[in-house]
Each structure stands twice: as structure tokens, then as C-alpha cells.
From Swiss-Prot:
Catalytic activity: N(6)-dimethylallyladenosine(37) in tRNA + (sulfur carrier)-SH + AH2 + 2 S-adenosyl-L-methionine = 2-methylsulfanyl-N(6)-dimethylallyladenosine(37) in tRNA + (sulfur carrier)-H + 5'-deoxyadenosine + L-methionine + A + S-adenosyl-L-homocysteine + 2 H(+)
Organism: Geobacillus thermodenitrificans (strain NG80-2)
Cofactor note: Binds 2 [4Fe-4S] clusters. One cluster is coordinated with 3 cysteines and an exchangeable S-adenosyl-L-methionine.
Domain Radical SAM core, first and last residues per copy: 221-451
Keywords: 4Fe-4S, Cytoplasm, Iron, Iron-sulfur, Metal-binding, S-adenosyl-L-methionine, Transferase, tRNA processing
Protein name per UniProt: tRNA-2-methylthio-N(6)-dimethylallyladenosine synthase
Complex formation: Monomer.
Amino acid sequence: MNEKQRLEQTGQIQTASHPADRKSDLERLKAKTTKDYEKYFTSVFLPPNLKEAKKRGKEEVQYVKDFTIPDEFRGMGRGRKFYIRTYGCQMNEHDTEVMAGIFMALGYEPTDRPEDANVILLNTCAIRENAENKVFGELGYLKPLKTTNPDLLLGVCGCMSQEEAVVNKILKQYQYVDLIFGTHNIHRLPYILHEAYMSKEMVVEVWSKEGDVVENLPKVRKGNIKAWVNIMYGCDKFCTYCIVPYTRGKERSRRPEDIIQEVRQLAAQGYKEITLLGQNVNAYGKDFNDIQYGLGDLMDELRKIDIARIRFTTSHPRDFDDRLIEVLAKRGNLVEHIHLPVQSGSTEILKMMGRKYTREEYLELVRKIKAAIPDVALTTDIIVGFPNETDEQFEETLSLYREVEFDSAYTFIYSPREGTPAAKMNDNVPMEVKKERLQRLNALVQEIAAKKMKQYEGQVVEVLVEGESKTNPDVLAGYTRKNKLVHFVGPKSLIGQLVNVRITQAKTWTLTGELANEAIEVN
């Protein structure tokens, strides 16, 4: 859904099909409830619809070049404070930066204490059931604040809001929630807040299909050393276990000139590192109709900008092409760290997951990358206990991990997500077996990580100093180009700077060192 479609559906642009469509949406959700919740709905009621979310139609994605806040909303937040709690991935972190920017443009002030806030938003993650349970627990914890402060607005946004079952559960069990909006319409936050203030009823506005690409959104970035830069939105891969294509919509890329301008501005402001973000970041540009331009082309232009480091996440093996490998091999400010989720080492399981590559194709891609960038640090994601996974298929995952020798991995027990094809499969792997497999995998991950880290002892590495250690304020902490955490003693004036550190001790997940005078040759 884009802005034109939203106006049609809410009645601001009249269409012949609108009244029936809107009534059917309302009746569809109400049919799943035991009470009449229509009194909680407002004129902007747009429920999530997973069936609609799966469609990848030809509706044109609108590019809005300049975000603006209408004059009537300016000052809305004067004398009010906002609090946002963020769950999940870097995309959610970036979305929170945007929402904070909008709040402050409206006149709100930030607070770190939910009890002091006039608006509380939970920016949610839907990737696993555990993440959702945390949000529902937090909603229960926040309920007393609504009693003590009736004017408080409590909202749920992010990926969970795109799920029908979640919205239905909130309508049934958390009726004190004031607003629900999704991932595609963050730029409409001023309108949603206004509606919530004016109606004093629950406001639900979730777009289930295409979103817009909106430029020049205000942002409040955390710190001034590293920055996220969104280069695309959505995912069209539809892996059978994954809810993201439903919650984040179709793939849609920002124009390269807008991205390049943003990175140049960040470099001019003194940022040292940027991370390019996308649910499937190396599908960037595949939706362009007027130019042939991919992530490799974008990286080739960004590497010419005077900024120390450029990363990207998360990539999909299917879209990792030779052009991207060729550009990454030029190095410079393009770091030699690639996150490349494999999910399983079994071709049969990969097929059931809908990953569209085989074990052999993944290993061939790894060989290409290592041939071009011999010292590359590869990290990955792996799911254990997928429906029908046998002991032999799990052993294939272990053997692939040993062959690639990843630097680290995010490992998970399979978590069924309602509305995905895998959720309909017979989940026939007992939980005790899943846990045992996860333990074995994690033991291997730690074994190889320790081996990889040991190689750093005696080496001099470049460290971007981010601040004090979380455990010792007298120790500084920062990250290498390969994303290794380094601790060392030094003056606080080094925070935000690139320094050389000689590694004296390696642990499984951290390195310890001392300031070094030696220069590092960067190819």
C-alpha cells in the first residue's frame, strides 16, 4: 500500500469498492473476537492482512522526496515527553531513530523513564515467538502507568503490528493500548498521534502491501561515530519459515543519489563508520526499471567517499553476485567482514526452507569470496530443529560449519511463525532434540571462534574506539574492521578515533591489547 492507496481505503479518495472492502476488513477481524470492539476503532482503522501482505502486485511504489510536518501539527509535543523501547534487528533500531526524529520535530522531548513519558511506543520484532512474548509482558508491566496517567498514549509499532493474530490479541487482551501502526507508515506518525489525541479511541493503521520510499525523514542518531543508512526496504524471498516478507513488504530500493548524498553528509559530520541496511540488502536495485544498478555499483561509488568504514547487512546468498565480490575486493573503506546466512548445511532442508540454493552452491560462493578476499571474516545464521530435520541432516550443518570456518554465528531453535508455510508443517523434532542440537552447534561455534581469535595475538589491528568498556570504565572498547571487540587502556580523548592496538590476549569473543605506534597497511 502506498499513500494513494491509503487515501482510497480510508475514504479521502472515494472509490467504488471502498465501503465494502473496509467493512469486510472490520468484520473479518471482529469475527475472531468474542466481544464487539468496534467502539475502539476510528476512521483510520486499517487492520493487517497476511494474505494481502504476500501479494507482490504491480502497484507503483511512490517516492516522496521531502518529508514535511504540516503546520497544524507543529508544537503538538510541547511540554510532552516520549519513550521508545526497541526490540529486534538493526532495521528496527534505525526506525526508532526516525520516529525519535519525528517526535522531536513535533516538539516532544525524549526521556529514558517510561513513567515520565506522555507517549510510549514499543517498536517490536516478529522474527521469533520469544521476542513477541517479551512485548506482551512489557505491555502488562506498563498497564499501571495508564491508570496513574490517563492521558498517556501507549502504542505498539514495528513488525508485530503487521500480524493479524497480534493485533487481534491486543484488541482482546490489551484494550488500554491507544495506537497500533506498522512498518510501512512510520512517516504518518504525526497524523496517527493527532487521531489518537482527538478520538481518545484505539487507532489502528497498518498497511499490508507496498509502502512508500520517503526521503529526508528526520533522525536522532545514537552517538556520532557509527550510523545506519537504509538503502532498501522489504523482502521478496518468502523463505518458508520467515515472517519478514509479510511484515516488511515488497522489496523497494532508495535511489542511489539519495543514498550517496546521505553518506556524504554523514562523512562531513565526522562519522567514521556506516552500515548499509536492508532485509535483503544485496537485492538492492533489482526493482529499478530505468537503470541497471546493484549493490556492487553502489558500493563502488561509496568507497570513493572519505569515510573510514562501510559495512552492509543482511545479505542473501542468492543475490551475492560476482560484481559485488569484485568491488569488495578493492577494499579501502569496504571492510573485509561479510554476514552470509546459510540457515542449514543440508540441501534437503534448504529446499524445505525455500532458500533456493543448495549446500554446494553456498560453498561455491564461499570459495569465490575467499579467493577474492583471502582474509575475509564470514559470519552466518543457522536454524536447528526445522520440521523433519534428521540427525544426518543436522550433521551436514556441522560439517558445513567446519568446512567454512565461520568467525561466529547467530544460532536459533526453529520457531514457527503463524501465517508462514513452515508453520503448517508437522513440527516433528522433539524439543529436547532441538536443544541438544543447539548445544552441539554452539560448542562448535565457540571452538572455531576461539581458534580464529587466537590468531590475533601479537598482531596490530585498527580499532574504532566507541567508548568505555561496559564492565570497566577505565578500559576503552572498540571494534576492528572485521567486527572483533577489542579492550585496551587509553585516554578518553581517543573515543571516536581510529587507533592501532597490539593484541596481547585473545578470548573466545573479545581481544585485549595495548596502544601501538605501528602503522597498519590497508590494501
